[in-house]
Amino acid sequence: MSLVYMNIMTAFMVSLAGLLMYRSHLMSSLLCLEGMMLSLFVMATLTILNSHFTLASMMPIILLVFAACEAALGLSLLVMVSNTYGTDYVQNLNLLQC
């Protein structure tokens, strides 16, 4: 495995660890999710380019579309929560609280 793939996998793992550790604020969770999606996009693009598998060349673009949709929904949820509660804590999203 080359050094580039190791760096991308390390970036994914760091983003995943950040998502698991810093999940109190919605903004930090969204940033970690974006880091994960970016590393997945780069990994998929490099894998397809190195394997010369042209049939799957649309997969990174589809992944990028899903990342853009996730970012738009996450930011709209962040605006809604910050307007309603005044903070961006993830605990405000719990619908089971009394």
Curated annotation (Swiss-Prot):
Subcellular location: Mitochondrion inner membrane
InterPro entries, per the entry: NADH_UbQ_OxRdtase_chain4L/K (IPR001133), NUOK/Mnh_C1-like (IPR039428)
Record's keyword terms, sorted: Electron transport, Membrane, Mitochondrion, Mitochondrion inner membrane, NAD, Respiratory chain, Translocase, Transmembrane, Transmembrane helix, Transport, Ubiquinone
Organism: Rangifer tarandus (Reindeer)
Protein role: Core subunit of the mitochondrial membrane respiratory chain NADH dehydrogenase (Complex I) which catalyzes electron transfer from NADH through the respiratory chain, using ubiquinone as an electron acceptor. Part of the enzyme membrane arm which is embedded in the lipid bilayer and involved in proton translocation.
Description of how the protein assembles with itself and partners: Core subunit of respiratory chain NADH dehydrogenase (Complex I) which is composed of 45 different subunits.
One GO process term, biological-process aspect: ATP synthesis coupled electron transport
Gene Ontology terms for molecular function: NADH dehydrogenase (ubiquinone) activity
Keyword set includes Repeat: no
Protein known as: NADH-ubiquinone oxidoreductase chain 4L
Family that this chain belongs to: Belongs to the complex I subunit 4L family.
EC number: 7.1.1.2
GO cellular component entries: mitochondrial inner membrane; respiratory chain complex I
Pfam families found in the cross-reference section: Oxidored_q2 (PF00420)
Membrane topology, as annotated: Multi-pass membrane protein
Record flagged with keyword Translocase: yes
Annotated gene: MT-ND4L
Transmembrane segments: 1-21, 29-49, 61-81
Principal location class: mitochondrion
Catalytic activity as recorded in UniProt: a ubiquinone + NADH + 5 H(+)(in) = a ubiquinol + NAD(+) + 4 H(+)(out)
Major enzyme class: translocase
